[in-house]
């Protein structure tokens, strides 16, 4: 099993969610996040004063899936989240040792 974590622009969330559903994925976890990469933040004007906003709003999507579904999920996220501009985000893939459904005690892919 693998866990995909994708950091994307907030306005792309609905497109990514739909793309993952079309790819056959059932459940995702979404968390609001703030961060920056190469784009470093931006300057804003407030009451006549300029200030630098270091952290930009992002959304983190997490999904656990079988190894055979990883490439399709990555491609679905990449295509749906891409704007072609700096700050589109990142996709991280990591191994998952075990999953347990709390309600039933099911484990492994049965718990996903």
Swiss-Prot record:
One Gene Ontology term, aspect cellular component: cytosol
O-UMP-tyrosine: residues carrying this PTM: 51
Entry-linked Pfam families: P-II (PF00543)
The entry's keywords: Nitrogen fixation, Nucleotide-binding, Phosphoprotein, Transcription, Transcription regulation
Gene Ontology BP term (one): nitrogen fixation
GO MF entry, a single one: enzyme regulator activity
InterPro entries per the UniProt record, alphabetical: N-reg_PII (IPR002187), N-reg_PII-like_a/b (IPR011322), N-reg_PII/ATP_PRibTrfase_C (IPR015867), N-reg_PII_CS (IPR017918), N-reg_PII_urydylation_site (IPR002332)
Family indicated by similarity: Belongs to the P(II) protein family.
Subunit note: Homotrimer.
Protein purpose: In nitrogen-limiting conditions, when the ratio of Gln to 2-ketoglutarate decreases, P-II is uridylylated to P-II-UMP. P-II-UMP allows the deadenylation of glutamine synthetase (GS), thus activating the enzyme. Conversely, in nitrogen excess P-II is deuridylated and promotes the adenylation of GS. P-II indirectly controls the transcription of the GS gene (glnA). P-II prevents NR-II-catalyzed conversion of NR-I to NR-I-phosphate, the transcriptional activator of glnA. When P-II is uridylylated to P-II-UMP, these events are reversed.
Protein name per Swiss-Prot or TrEMBL: Nitrogen regulatory protein P-II
Annotated source species: Mesorhizobium japonicum (strain LMG 29417 / CECT 9101 / MAFF 303099) (Mesorhizobium loti (strain MAFF 303099))
């Amino acid at each position: 099993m693998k866990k995909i974590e994708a950091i994307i622009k907030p306005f792309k969330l609905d497109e990514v969610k739909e793309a993952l559903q079309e790819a056959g994925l059932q459940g995702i976890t979404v968390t609001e996040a703030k961060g920056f990469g190469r784009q470093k933040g931006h300057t804003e004007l407030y009451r006549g004063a300029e200030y630098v906003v270091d952290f930009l709003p992002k959304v983190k999507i997490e999904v656990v899936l079988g190894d055979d579904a990883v490439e399709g999920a990555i491609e679905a996220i990449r295509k749906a989240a891409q704007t072609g501009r700096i700050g589109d985000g990142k996709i991280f893939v990591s191994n998952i040792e075990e999953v347990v459904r709390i309600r039933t005690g099911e484990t492994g892919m049965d718990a996903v």
